Amino acid sequence: MLYFRVSAMGSRSRKCSGVGDISFAERKIVMSSWENNVRKVVPYTPGEQPKEKNIIKLNTNENPYPPSPAAKAALEAFDSDDMRLYPAPDAAELVDAIAETYRVKPEQVFVGVGSDDVISMAFMTFFNSDKPILFPDITYSFYDVWAEVYGIPYKRIPLTADFRINAGDYSQPNGGIIFPNPNAPTGVLESTEMIESVIKANPDSVVIIDEAYIDFGGTSVLPLIEKYENLLVVQTFSKSRNMAGMRIGFAFGSKKLIKYMNDVKFSVNSYTMNRVTIKCGAAAVRDGEYFRATCAKIIGTRENAKKRLSQLGFTFPDSMSNFIFAKHKTASAKTIFEELKKRKIFVRYWNKPIICDYLRITVGTDNEMQALYDALEEILKEAAK
């Protein structure tokens, strides 16, 4: 930016000044003017990550069990000297392991730094229409953040009173569709038939199904990628694979869809997956026995939690995820949230319309859940006085 000022000597009435020549007041203007060109967004708010020890963490839907022994062995066997080398841009070892496990071709697999990275890349790649993309009004709150960041028009579609998707609402003109199945934060699972009806009604749009929680009782729509070229199915290692800290997400789609995503990815950052992640991820995804065993434990604990929470006066939509979206009949969700926190038990609460009466409770170990029930019983007794 150029500034003109009068010379005290009068030899030159005006001059072109740099920042070093101008007054403090003028300098403030120069230093702040860059903000006019900043993309300002309201960022996504992640779940609280408490630093203290001896807590019960049921607020971010992490898996309460350790990673696969195969992943641990891969970590221990990793040669630290390899850290000086760039990883393979195509992460072929991980991609091949995922393709082998899910019985698809490697060309139908995309990997990224968690499913957030995968979906963000999909937004960048596929949602470039002047028409709004569509997603539920109660859903994963990162969707509207990505839309804002990338300047994508969007429209929130209301769920039904029982937190379900009405397929007909997604037949309107759009620039793309995304929703989770099971939904987050409700845990409600939609049928494959309903999802296919949405895909059929939108042949000119990419439809993204976010299956972060599908392994806890749902049926993946993965087989439909062979039938619909415009379908992208996204999954993650963060929930059912016990590896949230490794940040591994992946997607399935037609070869054409995946090629477009890789073209964009390699134009932004070729080396998204580090060497340790590739090795450990490949080992973990091949350990099907451990994966199925931990999922079964979480499902069993979840079903018991439904009974116990019902006995304590909670209602909730039937969850097919690793969490329960619960509302108490009389006690305030905010009060319960705060009282649990005092007892070092962390759950998720949103002070937002429609869902402000609900708590999202991650399914922990049986011991963690028993501590939760004991604390809730105590809190509810105090609230009833």
Regions found by a protein language model. Give the residues of each.
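N-terminal "arm"/small-domain region of PLP-dependent enzymes with the aminotransferase-like
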Residues: 29-85, 173
